[in-house]
Swiss-Prot record:
Gene name linked to the record: RPC82
Organism encoding this protein: Candida albicans (strain SC5314 / ATCC MYA-2876) (Yeast)
Cell location: Nucleus
Ranges for region Leucine-zipper: 523-544
Name of the protein in question: DNA-directed RNA polymerase III subunit RPC3
Xref: Gene3D superfamilies: Winged helix-like DNA-binding domain superfamily/Winged helix DNA-binding domain (1.10.10.10)
PANTHER family in alphabetical order: DNA-DIRECTED RNA POLYMERASE III SUBUNIT RPC3, RNA POLYMERASE III DNA DIRECTED -RELATED
Main location: nucleus
Family: Belongs to the RNA polymerase beta chain family.
């Protein structure tokens, strides 16, 4: 991609800049041009893409096939003109961003073989199980083992069945379903057109949800039984479920927040609780919210998200108890006395013969008396290595998560049964990280002013001075920096009908959602900038890097000392940039959560 096209992608939007850069790095020049044009112009045919990019139609079509397979492009055939239209699909491009993290996580949680399966699926976009297992035909036991690993990954929702709707844009699918439902809803003299459209819309929502859930629920077209053993059908085509990995990222974010606010051991308990319900937890993307014009009011959006969460709670899919999470806790950590409950009762008088427990005689069935100790026994279960995990202690940790801080990290729906308020915690997570960023970048005074503005919602300079206990000069200076960073907005309030400047005063306010979106766009832009920086210094030293590839393993003999030093500097520079990229990516993942 030439400099003009890259500059156009950079100026257009942060997402355009990042996605074009990713396509250039992983897929080549033609793919990056196609993605850039689709972001700029929306849905286009292959001929229209060819005319705008000046690339032959034949090359465009062959590139589109690969992009569709890698989940980077949607296609749709119109019924009227029978033409194929293509639009951008973000899933494949996001998989390029997270691919390394996905493989590392699967390797840690499952093993090398499972990571290899996921890696092959990420490379090819989707895989037919039968085709993948042909490489193990020489070893029947290994083939059975691989089949079981596919089944485990599918049951844990890392793999899902590839459906037709995965290749089509949600807008096109919704429009088609809605038109069908509208035709099936007859006009009536006693029913208004508004009510008829609302009925058709309600039916279309049910149909769309049924269609989207069909790939994750087990059915006759997914599973089969061989010798009494459940297996996936050999002709089943599976693809990776990005939403499942994003749930894992949400789990990590919640655990880190608990670790910083309460402590390490409570965070371990919370991690076990989240992992227990992670697979069935609320989705990371809500299809109905992505359809323009369907749910517009912010209150309706919030109610819709909460209704899905409450439905999962009522179905007991995201509820747990101390006994449920007990087996998921690490065996090498002793939780005994990890929660100290102070009591103000007077200490009991010590026994005369020391601290030995009282002995009590119990008459057995055979008439022989047996002495037993009356020392207090706890309801604990002992693991294989002797570590005692006390259910009472786990309950205390859960109570600490419920009442230990101003934030309720769990909700108790019935005695001993808990759930996690995902939507509420997501908003708190974003707020906490945003305030931490303001404090780290702009200082303590800016942080105090931000908290003051948030508490008063709409205030002037004098109110901020009184609330934050700062001088007027300091407040004015910090407000300038906060406004420049788009953290605080100015509200002009005229005192006269002619809006004279001399009679106008200004108020300040903070809007969380707009700030989060602005920060998210900044993070996307920074990720693209880092990737471009890496590519730029690789191009600057292209000859040296090609020479290194030719003599790899014998560079000490064929390269000069200054070349070796420069090569080492390039490697360190790339590592530093990749570390920055990972940090920004982790922060971007937080603000991509839907609350």
């Amino acid at each position: 991609m030439d400099e003009v096209q890259m500059e156009t992608a950079r100026i257009q939007s942060p997402k355009s800049y990042l996605y074009t850069t990713l396509a250039t790095t992983h897929l080549g020049e033609i793919a990056s041009c196609i993605i850039s044009i689709l972001i700029s112009n929306g849905r286009l045919t292959a001929r229209e893409i060819s005319n705008r990019t000046k690339i032959p139609t034949k090359n465009i079509k062959s590139a589109l096939v690969s992009l569709i397979q890698l989940n980077c492009i949607y296609y749709w055939q119109e019924e009227k003109d029978r033409k194929f239209y293509y639009s951008l699909k973000e899933t494949g491009l996001l998989l390029f961003v997270y691919s390394g993290d996905i493989i590392n996580h699967i390797k840690r949680q499952y093993g090398e073989d499972e990571a290899e399966i996921i890696q092959n699926i990420l490379i090819h976009g989707h895989v037919k199980i039968e085709d993948y297992l042909t490489q193990f035909n020489h070893d029947k036991s290994m083939k059975i083992d691989q089949e079981n690993k596919f089944l485990k990954l599918f049951n844990d929702n890392w793999l899902i069945k590839l459906q037709d709707y995965h290749f089509h844009s949600l807008d096109d699918i919704w429009h088609k379903i809605f038109e069908e439902c509208l035709k099936d809803t007859p006009r009536s003299s006693v029913t208004s057109e508004i009510k008829r459209v609302a009925e058709a819309q309600a039916k279309a929502k049910v149909k769309l949800n049924t269609l989207l859930e069909s790939g994750t629920t087990g059915g006759g077209d997914i599973f089969t039984e061989v010798n009494g053993m459940k297996k996936l059908k050999p002709d089943l085509v599976v693809t990776f479920n990005l939403s499942r990995f994003q749930k894992h990222l949400r789990t990590n974010a919640f655990v880190n927040m608990v670790r910083s606010k309460i402590g390490v051991l409570t965070a371990i308990v919370y991690d076990a609780a989240l992992r227990y319900i992670e697979n069935k937890s609320p989705p990371m993307d809500y299809p109905l919210l992505d359809i323009p014009g369907l749910i517009n009011d912010p209150k309706d959006v919030k109610e819709y998200i909460l209704s899905i969460e409450n439905k999962l709670v009522n179905e007991k899919k995201i509820t747990f108890s101390a006994r449920d999470i007990q087996r998921l806790l690490p065996k090498d950590i002793d939780f005994k006395n990890s929660v100290i409950t102070p009591t103000f009762a007077k200490p009991k008088r010590p026994l005369e013969n020391g601290s030995s427990p009282t002995l009590k005689k119990i008459k057995l069935e055979d008439g022989i008396a047996s002495s037993t100790s009356t020392s207090t026994s706890t309801s604990s279960s002992t693991s294989s290595n002797g570590t005692s995990i006390d259910l009472n202690t786990l309950e205390q940790h859960l109570k600490l998560l419920l009442n230990g801080t101003n934030t309720a990290f769990v909700n108790e729906i019935s005695p001993g049964n808990y759930t996690i308020p995902f939507s509420h915690l997501t908003n708190i997570l974003k707020q906490n990280n945003f305030e931490a960023l303001v404090k780290a970048t702009l200082g303590d005074y800016a942080f105090r002013i931000l908290r003051c503005v948030k508490s008063m919602k709409l205030c002037d300079e004098k109110s901020i001075c009184n609330g934050a206990l700062l001088k007027e000069k300091t407040v004015r200076s910090e407000l300038y920096h906060l406004i420049k960073a788009n953290i605080i907005e100015i509200q002009e309030v005229p005192r006269s009908a002619d809006r004279a400047a001399s009679k106008t005063f200004y108020l300040f306010r903070h809007k969380s959602n707009s700030n989060f979106n602005y920060l998210k766009n900044c993070l996307i832009y920074d990720m693209a900038e880092i990737l471009n920086r890496i590519q730029d210094f690789k191009l600057e030293h292209k000859i040296l890097l090609e020479k290194y590839k030719l003599v790899e393993g014998q560079e000490d003999q064929y390269l000069l000392d200054r070349e070796l030093k420069l090569l080492n500097d390039l490697q360190l520079r790339e590592i530093k940039n990749l570390v920055k990229f990972q940090r920004i990516k982790s922060l971007y993942s937080l603000y991509s959560l839907v609350d």
